């Protein structure tokens, strides 16, 4: 009988990798778009700076075609390189585009001068001039920089050029972390990271770009898979070991730490809080299927190779297999553990249709009940004897009493037993925005019987988050309406009873008491409070 269980685990692993072996036998090539990429032909600081300003204007110009904006993005991203053209040729491997790299030797009135002569070249230069004109007109004379003096600056020395290029590229690289998973709520985290680099003196705030330009660039990154592919190739290249890296490469590598595993927070949080905590609840039969699934996914992740952390950015179809909808029970348990022991998980949006409330509460209770558990293998490696282990466990139990303070209760209370997120902010919500696979389990519905008005009034409207808060808000409004109607009805009945003769009042009161004996009702707001 044990063979079939081993085969089931092996089958799960095979199922995760099914269809990935071999090469396509059919013609699967797609149509391509021609992209013109302007790169400097020399290391002249003045030429490179003028070409950088040209690319900035193209991206914000409403008359520029998308292919033209993509080419300008390639120009900006590769400007830090000594030979941008060689960098693009070596790393660009995109079947969707046909890159035409144009070496620029000089600039005229802010646009590249075409080396070839003739009417065709003149028409192209006039078209580029119109793109720059519309960019400036649409911005009402504003420049891409917060400080307009940077736009009119004439850079002739290499040190100033390096500072300017690194600052511009750092702002572009910061955008990619949230460009796919949460572009609409990305400004707060982007501002924090920009402030960090300013504080560390790694960027020059004089070359800070306006929020309007950054929004245009963020939208371009969200829409263009080709630009993201090129940036991922650069990330994988700069992560490799070797000789000393330049300043620009180091800051790109640093930002890459935020980009890795974007959109896969659910998968890695399940491993961290569901498996590595080693709580006894993992022995439940209900978890065995999900454990086999997560084991197969970990093996698949390793087989994908260095591109695995970027599968969401690259829009690879395999990413859907890593969504928590494929292992909902284990994920729900892990989220219960995470929201109890990790303060940073309080901002994570877990309002998903496949959240199982019972296993979520089980995770919360396991984290509290097993606080102070000792890993025997680690204790043996540290050479701890039984007395030291007992003393350590007792110390943790004593300090865990303080975990039941208001801060922890407030953190756990953000998460409803039914899966609705109550309270909390929206920072880093994007990290859970991976594609959703529905598990087929019925979603939890909320009971809305009338209950105590004090509890309804005790929930402030500001505590309801934007995600999943609509049903909760409607429930509270309906509850308060029913309570108000009941209060009016009781007031009317009381006024009527006061007008009755005194000799009839006891009988009427007795009849009313029998007819209106309140029945035990479930608290309407039980789903607002966590099971603490």
Swiss-Prot record:
Please report the name of this protein according to its UniProt entry. Nucleoprotein
Keyword RNA-binding in the entry? The reply is yes
The principal location of this protein is virion
Q: Note down the stretches annotated as region Ntail.
A: 403-532
Subunit and partners: Homomultimer; forms the nucleocapsid. Binds to the viral genomic RNA. N0 interacts with the phosphoprotein (via N-terminus); this interaction allows P to chaperon N0 to avoid N polymerization before encapsidation. Interacts as N-RNA template with the phosphoprotein (via C-terminus); this interaction positions the polymerase on the template.
Q: Which organism is it from?
A: Hendra virus (isolate Horse/Autralia/Hendra/1994)
Biased amino acid composition, Low complexity: 451-471
A GO cellular-component term linked to this record: ribonucleoprotein complex
- Domains as described in the record: Ncore is globular and carries the regions required for self-assembly and RNA-binding. Ntail is an intrinsically disordered monomeric domain in the C-terminus.
Residue sites binding RNA per the record: 178, 193, 258, 352
Bias-annotated ranges (Polar residues): 491-507
